[in-house]
């Protein structure tokens, strides 16, 4: 939320170099990714379409407040889901092959952290000084690529 709240409405529409996507898409997707694990648990499927839907769905969140409210909602859903630890062992079909919900949520967390790292990399390009970017020690136990890109 701290990163999202540093941006103006105009900066949410800023398009990143290399892989063109808006900051709105990048940051909303960071919140959205863990819920895909919950949906995979419920449906038994984890598809490429699920992974790509953020490209359009993020457009429904126009302000930083909208994005943060969505993040709050997802955090609550994930906390409730994780109260039932037995759900994590369920194997689901995915475009990567069979995978447990635990592995999906762990991948989602690493993916979200990686996108937050991307956002902080892009901030100076928009004239924004990152406010207390996430320290690598905070996610030392999460599988996050060493390379930024």
Q: Which residues are covered by each model-predicted region?
A:
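Short secondary-structure junctions and interdomain/linker hinges
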Residues: 7-10, 85
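Short, contiguous alpha-helical
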Residues: 9-54, 93-149
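Acidic/histidine-rich alpha-helical segments that form the ligand environment
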Residues: 1, 55-95, 99-122
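His/Met- and acidic-residue-enriched segments that coordinate or traffic transition-metal cofactors
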Residues: 1-2, 7
């Amino acid at each position: 939320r701290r990163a999202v709240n540093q941006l103006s409405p105009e900066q949410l529409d800023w398009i990143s170099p290399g892989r063109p996507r808006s900051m709105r898409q990048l940051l909303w997707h960071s919140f959205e990714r863990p819920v895909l694990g919950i949906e995979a648990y419920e449906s038994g499927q984890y598809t490429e379409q699920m992974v790509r839907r953020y490209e359009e769905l993020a457009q429904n969140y126009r302000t930083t407040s909208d994005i943060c409210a969505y993040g709050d909602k997802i955090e609550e859903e994930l906390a409730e889901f994780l109260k039932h630890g037995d759900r994590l062992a369920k194997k689901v079909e995915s475009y990567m092959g069979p995978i447990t919900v635990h592995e999906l949520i762990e991948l989602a967390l690493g993916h979200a952290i990686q996108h937050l790292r991307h956002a902080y990399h892009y901030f100076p390009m928009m004239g924004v000084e990152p406010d207390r970017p996430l320290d690598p020690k905070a996610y030392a136990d999460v599988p996050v690529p060493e390379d930024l890109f």
